Amino acid sequence: MTIKLIVGLANPGAEYAATRHNAGAWYVDLLAERLRAPLREEPKFFGYTSRINLAGADVRLLVPTTFMNLSGKAVAAMATFYRINPDEILVAHDELDLPPGVAKFKLGGGHGGHNGLKDIISKLGNNPNFHRLRVGIGHPGDKNKVVGFVLGKPPSSEQKLIDEAVDEAVSCTEIWLQDGLTKATNRLHAFKAQ
């Protein structure tokens, strides 16, 4: 089993770039930077894309330029064009149920109220069986404050923890493609930024 498409969820535009909801894009941006594969806008895929070669595998990167709740349009366009199955896709997204400094891989499951995941599941023919990278951003403690929280910028102390978890997730993605998901998952799930 190999990954052929890695997606980082985000809202477009400078005003959202540093918000918690864009944590998935931070991960893809760092992966592209580390592997010297700059992202370029590709209108037919409704996003910024690049291509990397990891452990002999050809992997496409995508950061949709649609709004978060329309992310599925970009993912489905790329998956259809390159004939990529849902279980060959890794979607990185912000995760309220994990604290800053923690990131975890997961296969399948629901959308947990995340509008980006909800749209991707829908546009992949109601198929939730894609991989996810859940980047912890913490929870405001009150569900009525969630929207403002995810669209807000984390304080520098939290940003540092999120950045460290994203950095570790990039390293673990390279391990996944070279040595398999089990080894990558064991390492990532043992990590907690201090």
Swiss-Prot record:
Its EC number is 3.1.1.29. One of its GO terms (molecular function) is peptidyl-tRNA hydrolase activity. It is an enzyme of class 3 (hydrolase). The active site is at 21 (proton acceptor). One of its GO terms (biological process) is rescue of stalled ribosome. Monomer. Belongs to the PTH family. This is Peptidyl-tRNA hydrolase. It comes from Enterobacter sp. (strain 638). The gene is pth.
